[in-house]
Amino acid sequence: MIFAEEYIPKQVKDCSILDSRKKFKNKKNKNEKLLLEKRFSWMRSFLKNKKNIIELGSGNGASKEILKNKKIILTDIQKYPWINKKIDMTKLDLGRKLKGKVDVFIINHSLHHCSNPSKLLKKMSKYLKKNGLILINDPEISFFFKFFLYILKHEGWSFKVNIFNLKKNIFRSDNPWSANNAVANLLF
């Protein structure tokens, strides 16, 4: 049922990052460029004069180009030519050199793919400089969003989980495409 507290699709369809990147690079795709510009534009003022900027779950790598900021280090669970560093955000290990050195973390439409968001946020705090920032942009689950997720059988949601439990994942973590689209609603 669309209005349920929980919906877990039987088959999660994988998203093709390569196709997404190809669409993004296509100069004719003006609608997607406009959407991405709107999605990222609010971040620009927070990135001024920042040196160490890390995006977790960078996917097609659009942020670096849309924000026109070469300082952004793109990370993802899978290695692609445009990704600077392969990192599983659920385990977030940036090494000792970056502890207390990161100015800004960006998580754009990726937090709902993290099986333990509270644990991730706690780990991120170890790497942030004093007064460092975490910029999060994640979908809010509305009636219409639930409807589209249900029809597409792409990703699910659950409001039944304890999102603040650092020891328990909120969904199975063996599939990088698993997600809980209720994360933004539950955290914020």
Report each predicted region and the residues it spans.
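N-terminal, positively charged/glycine-rich alpha-helical extensions of SAM-dependent methyltransferases
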Residues: M1-F24
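Conserved alpha-helix/loop element of class I SAM-dependent methyltransferases that forms part
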Residues: K30-K51
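Class I SAM-dependent methyltransferase SAM/SAH-binding core
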Residues: I54-L94
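A conserved beta-strand element that flanks and buttresses the S-adenosyl-L-methionine
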Residues: I106
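Short catalytic micro-motifs in class I SAM-dependent methyltransferases
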Residues: H109-S110
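A short glycine-rich, Lys/Arg-flanked "PGG" loop and its adjoining helix->strand segment in the class I
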Residues: S118-L133
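Conserved class I S-adenosyl-L-methionine
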Residues: L135-L166
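Short alpha-helix
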Residues: A179-F188
